[in-house]
């Protein structure tokens, strides 16, 4: 194991620490480890079973109630079965990152009642394009849609980017979030996740705005977002370089039923971007999340469907992906075992609408563990 990696791992072992100094500074430290044993039945050659995981340490130094410094360090392990073997478009496991180590989010935050501001290296998906009900699911697209991650260099797990973000509550029903991100996420140095705040004119900037509305007696949370990337993109029709790509998206979370500790919830996602410079035409996802419908300790059941349509009118897109569309169905069950441990078996079916040499649609089976220290 490289020396840098050993030092990082040693630091991550100091978990759940809280120190309050005489000057009023408060230091806290938390560590979480997510891992899964996953297998697939893809016809492509390669290993069928993989053990992958993500170890994340988050340290926070609060200088008072309003100001804080935040540092995330991470370590990932395992192969990349989606990218290297199965070949699905949307990445079936949101843990997949290969073997990496280094910096995750690192930022200063100012926060008061109804307003926050962050400056530093950030993950786009921490505050934007997030469905609260979609967070239960293990497939990447239910966390952040593939139009954002495939269509542009989005700074989201594992890499991040320099950014300024803010959120303000306009009233009890309306919140507005804004962000400006470096147009190119921080690059890897071998397997090391670096810090890079250099802004390049050609790489541009990513501007995002996301109003959020609480409707139907707060049972519906509706986000209506828009982003514009000012970098250079290849026009899929002319092969010329053009400037800019924009997208419009929706994220909806709806509480269908509440009875004591039991809730039934729905979510919906939609995204479409500038066709000429985007590999994907549109994406939509929808799902059901049931909370505490099995007796005993806290538990969740999830069923979701996601569909991505490619811009297969363009020869370059057809040649690159050999797909017209891809549909995924996920069924999972998450059960708390201890305060610090939850387990989650899941099943996925991936329908790959291939253009040439179609193969059997792959099935994914996995068991995931969530461990908090």
Annotate each language-model stretch with its function:
Residues 34-42, 76-80, 126, 149, ...:
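Sequence/structural signature of outer-membrane beta-barrel proteins
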Residues 21-27, 60-70, 114, 173, ...:
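Short loop/turn motifs that connect adjacent beta-strands in outer-membrane beta-barrel proteins
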Residues 60-183, 278-286, 290-294, 298-315:
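Outer membrane beta-barrel
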Residues 214-314, 331:
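Detector for outer-membrane/organellar transmembrane beta-barrel domains
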Residues 361-373:
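Outer-membrane beta-barrel "beta-signal"
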Residues 54-56, 105-107, 163-165, 208-210, ...:
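Membrane-embedded beta-strand positions in outer-membrane beta-barrel channels/transporters
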Residues 29-37, 71-75, 117-121, 178-182, ...:
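Transmembrane beta-barrel strands of outer-membrane/channel proteins
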């Amino acid at each position: 194991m490289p020396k840098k990696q050993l030092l990082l791992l040693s630091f991550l072992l100091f978990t759940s620490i809280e120190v309050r100094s005489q000057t009023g500074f408060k230091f806290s430290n938390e560590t979480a480890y997510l891992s899964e044993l996953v297998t697939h039945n893809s016809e492509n050659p390669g290993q069928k079973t993989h053990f992958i995981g993500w170890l994340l340490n988050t340290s926070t130094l609060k200088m008072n109630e309003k100001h804080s410094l935040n540092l995330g360090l991470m370590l990932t392990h395992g192969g990349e079965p989606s990218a290297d073997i199965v070949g699905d478009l949307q990445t079936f496991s949101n843990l997949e990152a290969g073997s990496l180590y280094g910096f995750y989010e690192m930022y200063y935050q100012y926060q008061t009642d109804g307003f926050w501001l962050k400056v530093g290296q950030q993950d786009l998906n921490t505050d934007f394009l997030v469905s609260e009900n979609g967070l239960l699911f293990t497939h990447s697209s239910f966390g952040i849609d593939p139009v954002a991650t495939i269509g542009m260099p989005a700074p989201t797990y594992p890499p991040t980017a320099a950014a300024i973000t803010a959120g303000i509550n306009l009233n009890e029903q309306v919140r507005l979030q804004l962000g400006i991100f470096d147009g190119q996420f921080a690059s890897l140095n071998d397997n090391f996740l670096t810090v890079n705040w250099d802004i390049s004119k050609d790489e541009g900037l990513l501007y995002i705005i996301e109003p959020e509305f609480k409707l139907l007696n707060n049972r519906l949370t509706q986000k209506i977002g828009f982003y514009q990337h000012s970098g250079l993109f290849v026009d899929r029709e002319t092969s010329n370089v053009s400037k800019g790509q924009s997208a419009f998206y929706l994220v909806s979370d709806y509480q269908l039923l509440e009875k004591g500790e039991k809730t039934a919830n729905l979510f919906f996602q939609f995204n479409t971007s500038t066709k000429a410079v985007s590999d994907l035409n549109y994406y939509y996802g929808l799902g059901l999340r049931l909370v505490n419908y099995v007796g005993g300790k806290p538990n969740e059941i999830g069923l979701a469907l996601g569909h991505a349509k490619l811009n297969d009118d363009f020869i370059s897109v057809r040649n690159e992906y050999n797909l017209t569309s891809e549909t995924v169905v996920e069924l999972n069950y998450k059960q708390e075992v201890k305060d610090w441990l939850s387990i989650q078996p899941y099943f996925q079916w991936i329908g790959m609408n291939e253009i040439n040499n179609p193969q059997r649609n792959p099935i994914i089976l996995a068991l995931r563990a969530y461990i908090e220290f």
